[in-house]
UniProtKB/Swiss-Prot annotation:
Binds 1 zinc ion per subunit. Keywords: Hydrolase, Metal-binding, Zinc. Belongs to the MshB deacetylase family. Its cofactor is Zn(2+). InterPro entries: GlcNAc_PI_deacetylase-related, LmbE-like_dom_sf, Mycothiol_biosynthesis_MshB. This is 1D-myo-inositol 2-acetamido-2-deoxy-alpha-D-glucopyranoside deacetylase. Disulfide bonds: none annotated. Signal peptide: none annotated. It comes from Mycobacterium leprae (strain TN).
Amino acid sequence: MSETPRLLFVHAHPDDESLSNGATIAHYTSRGAQVQVVTCTLGEEGEVIGDRWAELTVDHADQLGGYRIFELTEALRALGVSAPIYLGGAGRWRDSGMRGTAPRRRQRFIDADENEAVGALVAIIRELRPHVVVTYDPHGGYGHPDHVHTHFITAAAVASSGVAAGLEVGADEYPGKPWKVPKFYWSVFALSAFEAGMNALQGKDLRPEWTIPPREEFYFGYSDKDIDAVVEATSDVWAAKTAALTAHATQVVVGPTGRACALSNNMVMPIFAQEHYVLAAGSAGNRDERGWETDLLAGLCLDGFDAR
């Protein structure tokens, strides 16, 4: 009898899950895996696209976070996930804002009590018992403070969730039955995929107000030799990812052909058909000629489950 695979994605704000891992999430839910997404803040400090949402922002009604709960719920539904999970509960920690911005509100995620935040995620891991956990790399992708802190909290929680209670140094201080996560991945962007995606775009894929970003904007990309795994989107999975991005209407605009999108800065991003990963902990399974796994579950004993 096969065991249902369980995957857990941990992100900082609503929309991060769709931008970084939308294809991967839809890939596994469409094959019967149990996938959950933990979001650490409501993205209250985010910029919005267009005048329609302007009154929601922090300088006006400060209701953007509440609205983004709706957006995230719709995006996850498009990806096949039943409902969002919020670290500590919805609104427990607030979006910290971009690096260099003045702290305007208390309870910023980057100021969260470490023991409380790690403990909240340990409790989720021990309850869900995921075979795979995914979050950002140590730089938080492009470096948003909440992304960096999400990496730190997730790495600590993955390490702590498998520690049994006892008197020894490092013994368990969190409730729940220990669960050692078999595989822990960082979600990363491949330079080769960015370049291929940008080169494939045509005028019909773009909106008039969009601009082409210089390559230096993608300074956080990874070379192929540093990547361990890839998940490739089928047409159905691609459609699910595009629908999820469209659901985040305050943050993302999808282009006319569904091949590209842009955030509030109007810089074009390809909607990637491949999503790439670095294996941070655990044992790799079979690799292809590039040296990449093509299944995040590779090497795990889940008899009878087909993730292809």
